[in-house]
A protein has these predicted regions:
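Non-ligating segments of multi-cofactor redox enzymes
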Residues: 1-192
Length: 192
């Protein structure tokens, strides 16, 4: 669906996991959910967030694949590893700064969100965005998002590495990029 963009707004996730169930039903996923669903421990409450593949402009997963099994289409969608090329080496899993790809042992293959390519390529919305009741995951025209207080960004910094993506994250007004301090994150994990 050209002219449409994918938006993720973690602040709107209500934890219903409708996206997870809908993703399992997508024809190309063989009953596997490609949604990364996370519980976030906040100081006073537990939050939830659903994440899809961010479809990087320069996908690290594809760059590190020794079998050249991960392809990016002209529309920017980064596809799951192609069988029989995928050797399930996990290089892509380890390299992705977002932690999105997963090796599915029963298929010996890397699988990840492909933005429901079987649907979006024929003008339909991805399954997860179709069922999300709170619009934490949405696939809409940019003008439909423009009225919201939050602003979309598709620029992420992981330390010194700048990553631009096809999927946008809704952020507070004035945020130009999402900066992830990896050293602070690792310090918290090792000293918890």
């Amino acid at each position: 669906m050209y002219g449409y963009e994918f938006y993720v707004d973690p602040s709107r996730c209500i934890g219903c996991q409708s996206c997870v169930k809908a993703c399992e039903e997508c024809d190309t996923h063989r009953g596997q959910s490609m949604i990364n669903f996370d519980f976030i421990d906040r100081s006073e409450t537990i939050g939830t967030a659903a994440y899809v593949c961010w479809h990087c402009d320069e996908p690290t997963c594809a760059q590190v694949c020794p079998a050249d099994a991960i392809k990016k289409g002209e529309d920017g969608v980064v596809m799951s590893a192609l069988k029989p090329r995928c050797i399930a080496c996990s290089n892509c899993v380890l390299a992705c700064p977002f932690g999105i790809p997963k090796i599915v042992p029963e298929y010996e293959q890397m699988m990840k969100c492909d933005m429901c390519y079987d649907r979006t390529s024929v003008g339909k919305r991805p399954m997860c965005a179709t069922v999300c009741p709170s619009q934490a995951l949405s696939y809409v025209r940019p003008e439909e998002i423009a009225h919201r207080r939050e602003k979309p960004t598709n620029v992420f910094y992981f330390g010194e590495q700048k990553i631009t993506t096809q999927v946008y994250m809704m952020t507070p007004p004035g945020t130009e990029a999402v900066v992830v301090d990896i050293t602070e994150f690792m310090w918290e994990k090792t000293n918890a």
